[in-house]
Amino acid sequence: MPGQISAVAVLFLSLTVILHGYQIREKEFPKARGYLQYTATSAEQITTKPLLQLINQRSHITLASRFKDDYIQMAAETSAIENTAHITMKTVTPVTTKSLPPISSASYTFVRSNNAHMTASSTDDTIGSGSIAHLPVPTTRASLAIVNYITGRATQLGGQTTLPKTFFTASHKSTTNQRPTLSTNVLGTSTPTHKDRSTTSPVPLVPRPTLVTWSSPAKIGTYEVLNGSRLCIKAEMGLALIVQEKDLDSATQRYFNIDPSLTHASGKCDSQKSNLFLNFQGGSVNITFTKEENLYYISEVGAYLTISNTEKTYQGKKNTLMMFETVVGHSFKCVSEQSIQLSAQLQMKTMNIHLQAFDFEGDSFGNVNECLSDYTVVLPMVAIIVVVICVVGLSVYKIRQRHQSSAYQRI
């Protein structure tokens, strides 16, 4: 019996000592116990286990945490009210769009001071399971404050910080053991490299004139010279240059037709003289018009030609001319070929020419004056036709006369 009483007394004494020690530990280390409770609660929440059914219980824990190296300061207030879980983030500029896994009830609020100059407007997003998180772009140093959602007051945190360039992101599909992954977004400007793919097309080489041994009709080109906005020279014609080379035994002629598509027309116009310049690869032609009272004519023609295979140049000028004379305001036309001897070795030939200089009414030719050579060709043809008609008429008349005389004799 005394042994049993001693055992009971020892047990009772042990319980008293344990209880007393527990009370002393409660008084001496409340902060450590609170920190351990918070650590256990936070670890349980981060692993995203099913939320505890907390009924009629409110716990408000205010946490101010800092990242290392003074990167970010943020205010956190955690509250657990029944089964509600939400996160409110105020961001400055949305950069990346990610989905965070289910997180316990915690409210994170970023507050920027008035002296922080940001270009983008703030946006509010509530983050839950499957929602979208917009993360801020760190462009300036902004002060952060702790916001108490119960009292509605904000406590300013001292110091300024620059938001880091590393953010926490998570995939859309979350599991119970999934943890946020680090996604580093390197912000900065980079100059893109553009490859210059523009190519300079080579300038086509126009061959120099090549002479041929046969004559062929030259192409008809239209050449105009303007005096300001008014037309002062207009010419429609075909041109050919003839090279004459004499040997000891014989003389040969070779031909070069001027191509209008490869010829550039220019010139100058005065009240009494006007010039038409025709430039092409390997040569040129210069025609001068002179005006006297109410008449005008071609007074000078010059040309030069460089042959491609021999690199030999032929040139000549005729300045005592009075060709294609016509009335001022009229145009001159000559269908037949006309030849001008410029030098002993160079000759110019015109064909189907129609030109006018000086006074124009609009952009069209005036009344046409034709050259005599055209008349010399036309008049013989007309005479031949008239003679043929007369012969046919006389023949018909004689035949009819014979028929009539034979009819009278029968009667």
Curated annotation (Swiss-Prot):
Where does it reside? Cell surface; Lysosome membrane; Cytoplasmic vesicle membrane; Early endosome membrane
Which Cys-Cys disulfides exist here? 232-269, 334-371
Q: Which residues lie on this side of the membrane: Lumenal?
A: 22-376
Point out the glycosylated residues in this chain: 227
Q: Name one GO biological process term.
A: adaptive immune response
- Transmembrane stretches, start-end: 377-397
* Signal peptide location: 1-21
Pull the Cytoplasmic topological domain ranges from the record: 398-411
Biased region (Polar residues) positions are 172-192
Membrane topology of the entry: Single-pass type I membrane protein
Which keywords has UniProt assigned to this entry? Answer: Adaptive immunity, Cytoplasmic vesicle, Disulfide bond, Endosome, Glycoprotein, Immunity, Lysosome, Membrane, Signal, Transmembrane, Transmembrane helix
Q: Where is this region: Disordered?
A: 172-204
Q: Which GO terms describe its cellular component?
A: alveolar lamellar body membrane; cell surface; early endosome membrane; lysosomal membrane
State the oligomer form and interacting partners. Monomer. Interacts with FURIN.
Q: Which family does it belong to?
A: Belongs to the LAMP family.
Tell me the function of this protein. Answer: Lysosomal membrane glycoprotein which plays a role in the unfolded protein response (UPR) that contributes to protein degradation and cell survival during proteasomal dysfunction. Plays a role in the process of fusion of the lysosome with the autophagosome, thereby modulating the autophagic process. Promotes hepatocellular lipogenesis through activation of the PI3K/Akt pathway. May also play a role in dendritic cell function and in adaptive immunity.
Name by which UniProt lists this protein: Lysosome-associated membrane glycoprotein 3
Q: Which organism is it from?
A: Mus musculus
